[in-house]
Curated annotation (Swiss-Prot):
This is Glutaredoxin-1. It comes from the Eukaryota. GO terms for cellular component: cytoplasm; mitochondrion; nucleus. It comes from Mus musculus (Mouse). Changing C23S: Loss of activity. The modification N-acetylalanine is found at A2. PROSITE patterns: GLUTAREDOXIN_1, GLUTAREDOXIN_2. The modification N6-succinyllysine is found at K9. Disulfide bonds join C23-C26, C79-C83. Keywords: Acetylation, Cytoplasm, Disulfide bond, Electron transport, Redox-active center, Transport. Transmembrane segments: none annotated.
Amino acid sequence: MAQEFVNCKIQSGKVVVFIKPTCPYCRKTQEILSQLPFKQGLLEFVDITATNNTSAIQDYLQQLTGARTVPRVFIGKDCIGGCSDLISMQQTGELMTRLKQIGALQL
């Protein structure tokens, strides 16, 4: 169930972030990504606490990405990590490059 839930969210051409709304790193990640000009429907924040499988979802994220912490940021099918990874990519310009590569932005 958790595996299906996560796998159906992750899609090429889309940015998906698995979050918990009370997490300050999740809020920072949402703030950063929400300022970018995404095409409609290509940025999704998934609140894993809204399911009754939060722990199982985090276990599967651990299996898939090597970490069970949130946020878990996927650009297309690739997990780039969490908030600090996103900030690093933003500072180097790699974030915009990757988002343009998958066609997620309105330019």
